[in-house]
Structures are given as structure tokens and as C-alpha cells.
């Protein structure tokens, strides 16, 4: 399926130079003073793991890989692999940990993830857009801190560091975006 260069998003898998590439960072849309607008894209080759930057004109169309998406449940780690179970047929598959990279720490037991397949080969794992995690370390609450929109560093139960509002305390649960690891809100 062809998509416009302006429609490229993080996580998209593109067919580029007869190889499969995953978009690893948010594309930068640039409108220079002279010349046409372009989109700067950082991509990672799914076969070799090499990264490259590519520049596409805003009017370019690229081939987006036709992927089959299935729901899987994360069961456990086995060496350098994740063991996942198909939620419909209960088949188990092993997928290398490096497929998730820095998002690996968001993975929790029994979490449902979407696995994308290309020609029956697993290519990509998508986590839920947000997860609920507990604050394990942060500075003490400062009285009257709710009046300002300042943030303080916090370490979550999975070891990830995020900036949270001043009024949050250790032990509170918060919602965190998995794509950019930022605080969303206090968990309800």
C-alpha cells in the first residue's frame, strides 16, 4: 500500500530499496525557505539492524509493508527471547528481546501486545499506547506545589525515569505513554 511521505509515523514499516525498514523516530517535517518541503526519516533495517536517515519530498509516495497483526499475550522471558501466546489459537512463539529495544521495560506479565507479521515472519511488537506504573522513587511533596506546573524526576517500578508533577508521592500509580515515556496523568 502506498502512503504519502507526510503520513509516515514512528513504527511504520516501509519497503525501501527492496528491504524492510522500520521508522525509529518521529519524522521531521521541514519547509525550507528555498526549495520544496521534505520529510527527514530515521529508519532501521529489519534484516541487518543498520540505521539510516532518508529524506523524502513531501509529494513522494512510499510503499508501506502489508502486515498481518495478531494479538499475543506475554508469558515470560526465556534467555534472550520473549515467549508470547496467540490469544485465539494458544500457539506459542519466541521473539528476540531486541525487537522491543528500550520499550522492553514496559512489558509486564500477561500483557496483551500486537505482533506484526510480514510473510508469516514476526517483524514488530506494538505495546499498548499507555501503561499504569507505580512511582518507586521521587523527591518529597512540597506544600503548595499544586499551584505551579513544575515537574520533578521520578523513578518508576520498572526503572524508567520520568518527570512528574510536584504533588505526586512514592507509591502512587501514574499513566505513562509507551512511545515517548512521558507522564500522562494520575491513575484512576
From Swiss-Prot:
Keywords: Cytoplasm, Elongation factor, Protein biosynthesis. It holds the Pfam family EFP_N. HAMAP family: EF_P. The keyword Magnesium does not apply. Coiled coil: none annotated. It comes from the Bacteria. The gene is efp. InterPro entries: Elong-fact-P_C, NA-bd_OB-fold, Rib_uL2_dom2, Transl_elong_fac_P/YeiP, Transl_elong_KOW-like, Transl_elong_P/YeiP_cen, Transl_elong_P/YeiP_CS, Transl_elongation_fac_P. It comes from Rickettsia massiliae (strain Mtu5). Involved in peptide bond synthesis. Stimulates efficient translation and peptide-bond synthesis on native or reconstituted 70S ribosomes in vitro. Probably functions indirectly by altering the affinity of the ribosome for aminoacyl-tRNA, thus increasing their reactivity as acceptors for peptidyl transferase. This is Elongation factor P. Belongs to the elongation factor P family. GO terms for molecular function: translation elongation factor activity.
Amino acid at each position: 500500500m502506498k502512503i504519502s511521505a507526510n503520513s509516515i509515523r514512528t513504527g511504520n514499516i516501509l519497503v525501501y530499496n527492496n528491504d524492510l525498514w522500520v521508522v525509529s523516530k518521529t519524522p521531521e517535517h521541514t519547509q525550507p525557505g528555498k526549495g520544496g518541503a521534505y520529510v527527514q526519516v530515521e529508519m532501521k533495517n529489519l534484516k541487518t539492524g543498520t540505521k539510516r536517515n532518508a529524506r523524502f519530498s513531501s509529494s513522494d509516495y512510499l510503499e508501506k509493508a502489508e502486515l498481518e497483526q495478531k494479538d499475543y499475550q506475554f508469558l515470560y522471558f526465556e534467555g534472550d527471547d520473549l515467549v508470547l501466546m496467540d490469544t485465539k489459537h494458544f500457539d506459542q512463539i519466541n521473539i528476540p528481546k531486541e525487537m522491543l529495544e528500550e520499550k522492553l521495560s514496559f512489558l509486564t506479565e500477561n500483557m496483551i501486545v500486537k505482533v506484526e507479521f510480514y510473510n508469516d515472519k514476526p517483524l514488530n511488537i506494538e505495546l499498548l499506547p499507555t501503561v499504569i506504573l507505580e512511582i518507586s522513587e521521587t523527591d518529597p511533596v512540597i506544600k503548595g506545589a499544586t499551584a505551579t506546573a513544575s515537574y520533578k524526576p521520578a523513578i518508576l517500578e520498572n526503572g524508567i525515569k520520568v518527570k512528574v508533577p510536584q504533588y505526586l508521592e512514592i507509591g502512587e500509580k501514574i499513566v505513562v505513554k509507551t512511545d515517548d515515556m512521558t507522564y500522562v496523568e494520575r491513575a484512576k
